[in-house]
Amino acid sequence: MVDFILNAQVRSDLGKGASRRLRRNAGLVPAVVYGGDKEPQSVTLELREIAKLLENEAAFSHVIALNVGGAKETVLIKALQRHPAKGFVMHADFLRVVADHKLTAHVPLHFINEEVAVGVKQAGGEISHTISEVEVSCLPKDLPEFIEVDMAKVELGQIVHLSDLKAPKGVELVQLAHGNDLAVANIHASRVVKEEGSEEGAAE
């Protein structure tokens, strides 16, 4: 599953000073590619190109074809370092992907049917999201773009846990496999309802 392409060049000028010069003078981003029983490789990316790639949420959970000076690597985005104020990418880590080796990656959660959830539509509750992504383990070909959380039947006061999610075939939720059935979302009483109740109690 390779839907994204990114171009890079081998980087030989290493160190913090060299990285700063790249970003300041050439509009380039230093990065490293590692894993897959190969030596880590330092590369540079065009800031504009990686910024455009990251506009698509799916890029974070898809295998990327990284062209490094004519050689192709299949990778996942493993980590990004961003400027604390301006938000642009300052450094990127890519993990090599091997077709027959399981990988771990963070996949976003997509919450659906929130407006028709029992606890919202019938009881006037509000939905709170505890987490927005999950770590999964699977073969590269099975890596999902996202995992859906169907809120339609969730009632007021009910908590949705990892064990309630339907992971695609071949996909394992890492935290759940380790015995951590994390809370994902819940429906609680609306603040407006709580405030109105408090005011009525005070009036009595």
From Swiss-Prot:
Example of a GO biological process term: translation
UniProt keyword annotation of Ribosomal protein present: yes
One GO MF term attached to the UniProt entry: structural constituent of ribosome
Family that this chain belongs to: Belongs to the bacterial ribosomal protein bL25 family. CTC subfamily.
Function summary: This is one of the proteins that binds to the 5S RNA in the ribosome where it forms part of the central protuberance.
Name by which UniProt lists this protein: Large ribosomal subunit protein bL25
GO CC aspect terms: cytosolic large ribosomal subunit
Gene: rplY
Pfam families associated with the record: Ribosomal_L25p, Ribosomal_TL5_C
RNA-binding listed as a keyword: yes
Keyword list, A-Z: Ribonucleoprotein, Ribosomal protein, RNA-binding, rRNA-binding
Quaternary structure (record): Part of the 50S ribosomal subunit; part of the 5S rRNA/L5/L18/L25 subcomplex. Contacts the 5S rRNA. Binds to the 5S rRNA independently of L5 and L18.
